[in-house]
Amino acid sequence: MDCDIYGPSVPLMMGIREKPEISSAQKMIPLTSHGVKLMSMGFLLPGDEPVIWRGPMLMRTIQQFVMDVDWGKLDILLVDLPPGTGDAQLSLCQTVPLDGGVIVTTPQEASLGVVRKGIGMFEKVNVPILGIVENMSYFTAPNGDRVEIFGHGGGAKEAQNQGTPFLGEIPIFVEIREGGDSGVPVVVHDQESPPALAFSNLANKLREILL
């Protein structure tokens, strides 16, 4: 469920641009791509039309995504949220009981400061933190050197400080960007590639925590 209402990217990254149909119960039927049920504001707007809404409209949309979509039986409902502690986060927490939040950061302090605010917000609304993921941890240069553009270990250190699991690093891979642009995620295109394994390891850790 894509709750980045102002900047939805799920349609592009999952390679699907259709509009959802309406069921006999007057609920939207989520679209499916690569075996995943999806709902996004990007399915409801033409092209690159912007969403220019105040908070109450955003809140109602998120409520509709939860209550007026025929999700059926799910293993896990994964919600993509924008950065920060704004209306999207608060609306979601007020609409549905959450098993927990996964915090995504980059290694540098500028990002970690925002992360601490996010953790504090979830704590205030009684949503447990399932773990921290460090994105864009490093890239491997053509000569094989590991280059840490944004510093090293910030996510792991913050997880230790917060007393929450560190779920892993996602390095910078060209394949991740290419998969997102083409609508074929790297975990679908080549399941045994290093970038796919980075995501698979993260998913397995999260599944062990939840199930």
Report the location of each language-model feature:
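Conserved beta-strand segments of the P-loop GTPase G domain that flank and frequently precede/overlap
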Residues: 40, 103-106, 132-133
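Phosphate-binding/switch loop-helix module in NTP-utilizing enzymes
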Residues: 44-92
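C-terminal lobe/tail of nucleotide-utilizing enzymes
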Residues: 119-211
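Conserved nucleotide-binding/hydrolysis micro-motifs of P-loop NTPases
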Residues: 5-7, 44-48, 83-84, 107-111, ...
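Conserved Switch II/interswitch segment of TRAFAC-class P-loop GTPases
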Residues: 72-79, 85-86, 97-118
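Hydrophobic residues in beta-strands of the RecA-like P-loop NTPase core, especially within AAA+ ATPase
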Residues: 1, 78-79, 133
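Glycine-rich phosphate-binding loops of nucleotide-dependent enzymes
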Residues: 39, 62, 81, 94, ...
